[in-house]
Amino acid sequence: MATAAPDIITTKLERSFAALDTDHDGHLDRQDYQRLADRYLDVYHLGPDDRRARALHAFLQTYWLELLRHADVQEDRLSRDEYVAAVRLASADTSRLNLADGLGHVLFDVIDANSDNQIAREEFTRFLTDVWNLEEADALKAFRTLDTDGDDTVSRPEFLQAIRGYFLLSDPDAPGSLFFGTP
């Protein structure tokens, strides 16, 4: 009997769940998103009044509320399966929040530490290794894949396209599929 190929989007979202569930309780809650924001602020040395920090906090709060809305759960926490289903729904429903583009712009502004409107290899590697705890080799592979024009930087359009691909494409070789390692 043949086994079905794994659903790449589910695999990607399960990996992001594991990375977000830093207290390893099997659920995500608002505190997990607060810890994520704190990691970004710490890694990028952003104070609470920095506009990038405020934008990150505002987006993550809205994102969390959208996940809860789409999950239709009684508690303010999500299991892995509830998270995967909610992210899929929130990614497709842009009536209140365009998840992929909103996240892409907020993260790009944080990662682009020198504000030159492009992400250098070092900036991108820092993002995946220091914030998301990926191995440097995986971060460099992801960088090379996202740099679709080969200019050794990731432009805002390249980054946004990769974020969209992360949430919406089932192609394991798509640039956004490599954010949390090879699916």
Residue ranges and their predicted role:
Residues L97:
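Divalent metal-cofactor coordination and adjacent catalytic microenvironments
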Residues A2-T3, D50, A86, D93, ...:
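Domain-level signal for compact, non-enzymatic binding modules
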Residues T10-D25, A53-R77, D101-D116, D138-R156, ...:
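Primarily EF-hand calcium-binding motifs
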Residues A2-L46, D50:
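The feature marks the first
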Residues D29-G47, R77-T94, Q118-W132, S155-L169:
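Amphipathic regulatory helices of Ca2+-sensor modules
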Residues A4, R35, L60-W64, T94, ...:
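Aromatic-enriched hydrophobic runs in primary sequence
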Residues G165-P183:
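Acidic/histidine-enriched, glycine/proline-rich intrinsically disordered or flexible terminal extensions
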